[in-house]
Amino acid sequence: MGLYLDNASTTPLLPEVKDFIINNLDTFGNPNSSHKIGDRAKDIIDYSAEKVANLINTNAENIIFTSGGSASNTLAIKGFSEAMQHSKILYSPTCHKSIIEVSKRMFVSKSLNVDGTGRIIVSDLERLLEDNILYNTLVVVDLGNSEIGTVQNISLISEVVHRYNAYLYVDCTGSIPYIPLDVQKLNIDMAGFSAHKLGALKGCGVLFKKSDVPLSPLIYGSDDYFSGTQNVLGIGSLGVSAELYPNFYKKINSKNRSILYSELEKRLNNFYLVGSSEYRLPCNLNVCFPGVDSGNVVSILDDKYDIQCSAGSACNNYSSSLSPTLLAIKEKNPSSCVRFSLSGFEKKMELIDAAKKIASVVEGLRYWAEQNTM
């Protein structure tokens, strides 16, 4: 029996989402059409906007549907830069690659400094904001890093950002499956996330935007910020999961992560936690096995034991370059880090069995390495 421990890459469809898809396969209408078939599709879009808005404590008018998390990131950053003269982007180096790459392409941008766990050094952020007071600045951070699990102090960052009349965009794709998001309480100007991290369909994302935040469209063709015929089933599937997730938040905690880590400690020496132990997503376990190639660990666990995990962010798994996040925190063994991202609903015996198999693979690879260096 396999065990899927790669939920930070994507999640299986919720049963309720599957039911919604099956029941709406014939809802083929264009939501912009002015007839009853189009109206049915429009009803699904409106329903989903309300449910997503309720999930993050805002109004449906502030919800923009996109094609995914990367599209939301790009719309927020590029749209802000085009809408504001003398704009500058300050971004966290631990953010998703889509954020880093689009930020570098803006007229003026700068990477923020982080500590060894990946948390923003707020005093450095404040200095940069003070030095760049003449710019219209957008600060871009992730709430919870999907690779190393570190959670940022968004309340403090927001307070500092707005003290200098700057704007704050928060990428919540990695955190929203595990941590409730209240955009009003945190005083966030814009936030984005992806549907497929919440048990919904791929190809759908969300951008929350306060009504007074300046933004230019990413795709032109209508009066919308993200023009094109909307993905009705994808957006509808997100509406279903958004309605269910408040109950999930009540059940998700760090218990299963602690079980897996403690079981590894019983069986392995010379490994350590990557990221913050105190400020961490409850279902993220990124560990470093020095002397072992993380890609080999991932491949053997999958092929031999049907256990799925990751050697970092899924977006970087087919790249030969090292993880920008691990480089940003100055991880000394970046090619030996393995991410286990749990759902929070695994059974204890499944995790104990997984720990045995993980330890066996790591010990086997270390033994092989020793024999080949003699």
Model-flagged regions — what are they?
Residues 1-374:
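Pyridoxal 5′-phosphate
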